[in-house]
């Protein structure tokens, strides 16, 4: 059943070797509405790849975190902001409503580490090094991003697509992922390999990410507020 119909004149179009058809809608000079770029996958993806994408990659995506745009492994988490990851884990655990903008929270050590260690094989020592940890009260400081000051998501960014996978002998699975960016007409804005450890009871852990190819810079990522800037924005709350 047809629920939406939109007719337009195309300004440009391109078909790629990987089976994508990109099209740009014509807009007159001075137009200030939604983007006119569209991407259509003509060559269908393997059903298993789509399932893997929905389960492991889309929950993080590329918005306000660098989990899939940085190189890291269980031996080296450099380049990853643990608070960005924690934000996404809270969303996956459906606990985002517990925290409000402009407030400082002290999360008990066990609670913070339990959420992380459910999805990552990471020690408490590493987590404490990359966060603000208060030894005397055994808590992690946590502040959400602010809608006004450091949230600022860019609406037109790439989206991930798992195109193949390898089941490894050690019980992990490596997903080959292409970042599709309609606004740039790129079906491989960058490519990365994500290794997942499969556990019992449908559980899993992220093991590593490796960016194998990139044609772009990650210009849409917004850094979290520094302590000084946070006090300037929210100090009176």
Which residues does each PLM region occupy?
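Functional cores of ribonucleases/endoribonucleases
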Residues: 11, 148-190
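A short, structured loop/turn motif at beta-sheet edges
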Residues: 15-17, 164-173, 196-203
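Low-complexity, intrinsically disordered terminal/linker segments enriched in charged
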Residues: 34-45, 184-193, 199, 206-237
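Short beta-strand elements that form the blades of beta-propeller/WD-repeat-like
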Residues: 14, 19-25
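A mature extracytoplasmic/lumenal domain signature
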Residues: 131, 177-181, 208-210
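Short glycine/acidic-enriched loop and turn motifs that connect beta-strands
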Residues: 27-31, 182
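Core segments of small alpha/beta cavity-forming domains
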Residues: 1, 45-147
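Repeated scaffold domains used in trafficking and secretory/extracellular systems
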Residues: 5-13
């Amino acid at each position: 059943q047809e629920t939406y119909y939109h007719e337009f004149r195309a300004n440009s179009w391109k078909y790629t070797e990987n089976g994508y058809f990109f099209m740009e809608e014509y807009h007159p000079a001075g137009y200030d509405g939604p983007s006119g770029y569209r991407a259509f996958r003509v060559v269908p993806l393997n059903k298993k790849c789509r399932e893997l994408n929905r389960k492991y990659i889309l929950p993080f995506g590329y918005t306000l975190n660098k989990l899939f745009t940085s190189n890291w492994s269980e031996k080296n988490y450099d380049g990853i902001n643990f608070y960005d990851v924690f934000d996404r884990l809270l969303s996956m655990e459906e606990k985002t409503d517990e925290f409000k903008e402009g407030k400082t929270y002290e999360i008990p050590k066990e609670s913070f580490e339990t959420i992380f260690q459910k999805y990552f094989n990471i020690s408490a020592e590493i987590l404490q090094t990359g966060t603000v940890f208060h030894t005397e009260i055994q808590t992690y400081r946590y502040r959400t991003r602010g809608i006004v000051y450091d949230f600022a998501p860019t609406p037109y960014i790439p989206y991930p697509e798992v195109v193949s996978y390898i089941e490894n002998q050690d019980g992990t699975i490596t997903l080959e992922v292409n970042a599709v960016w309609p606004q740039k007409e790129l079906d491989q804005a960058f490519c990365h390999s994500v290794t997942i450890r499969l556990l019992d009871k449908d559980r899993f852990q992220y093991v590593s990410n490796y960016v194998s190819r990139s044609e772009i810079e990650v210009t849409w990522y917004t850094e979290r507020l520094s302590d000084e800037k946070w006090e300037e924005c929210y100090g009176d709350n």
